[in-house]
Amino acid sequence: MASSSSNRQFSHRNANTFLTYPKCPENPEIACQMIWELVVRWIPKYILCAREAHKDGSLHLHALLQTEKPVRISDSRFFDINGFHPNIQSAKSVNRVRDYILKEPLAVFERGTFIPRKSPFLGKSDSEVKEKKPSKDEIMRDIISHATSKAEYLSMIQKELPFDWSTKLQYFEYSANKLFPEIQEEFTNPHPPSSPDLLCNESINDWLQPNIFQVSPEAYMLLQPTCYTLEDAISDLQWMDSVSSHQMKDQESRASTSSAQQEPENLLGPEA
C-alpha cells in the first residue's frame, strides 16, 4: 500500500501557533528568523524556538508563534523549513505551551514580546475573559483540521484525549481510515510489451516446464522397454503426435456447428 492521503482540506486559523519539527537539527535562531518571515503578512509579535533531544539522541525543535492577526493557511507544508515538516497545532493555552517548550531545552531563541493568554491585542482584557477548558468537540475539531496523516491523527488524540483513546481506539481507527484512506498502488505489468517480440519467452518457458506435462524421449524409453535407442523414441513420439493431430482435425471437420440438425427421413409405413 501506498502512503495514506487525506480526503479533506487541511486548515489552520489561530493567532497562537505551536509547531513541532521532529528530527530537526536546525539552529533555533535560524528557524525563528525563517518562520518570522513566513508570517509577516499576519504581523508577528512573538516567537520562541527551543531545540531538545530525544531519548535516542536525535534532535527536535519546538516553536511558539504569536501574531496580531490569526494565521490562516490551508497548506500543511506552509511552515516547512529546509525540508523539515512540522506538526502544526493551535496553542490553546500559550502559557502552558511556553512552559512545555522551556522545560529541558538544549538551545533557545526568542524574538518579540510574549503575550499571555487573552491579552488586549486579541480583543479582550484579562478581566473580561476567564480561561475556559476546551470541550471534546472543540479538541476533535482542531485535531481533524490539523492532522495530515493517520498516524499523526491518532497520536494527537492519544495526547489530547488519553482516556477516550484507550477505551475507544477502534472507533478512532475507523475514523482515521475514513479521513486518510490507503491509496491503492497502480498495477505495473512485470512483462511490458516490446517490439518486435511481444512476449517474454523466458518467463513463458519458466512457467511451461513445471506446469505442462511433456513426454521427453528419455522418459518414453523408460516407459517402453522395447524402445532401445533415442532415435526410436523420437520417431515414435513424432508418429504419435502426427496421428493425434490428424485425429483432432478429423473430429473438428465432422463436428456440426449448425443449429439446424438433419432430421431422419420419414419412411413409408406398410400398405393397408
From Swiss-Prot:
The keyword ATP-binding does not apply. Its main location: host cell. It is found in: Host nucleus; Host cytoplasm. Residues 254-264 have a biased composition (Polar residues). Divalent metal cations, possibly Mg(2+) or Mn(2+). A motif (RCR-2) lies at residues 60-62. Homooligomer. Interacts (via LXCXE domain) with host retinoblastoma-related protein 1 (RBR1), and may thereby deregulate the host cell cycle. Part of the C- and V-complexes which are RepA-Rep-DNA complexes involved in the c-sense and v-sense transcription. This is Replication-associated protein A. The lineage of its organism: Viruses, Monodnaviria, Shotokuvirae, Cressdnaviricota, Repensiviricetes.
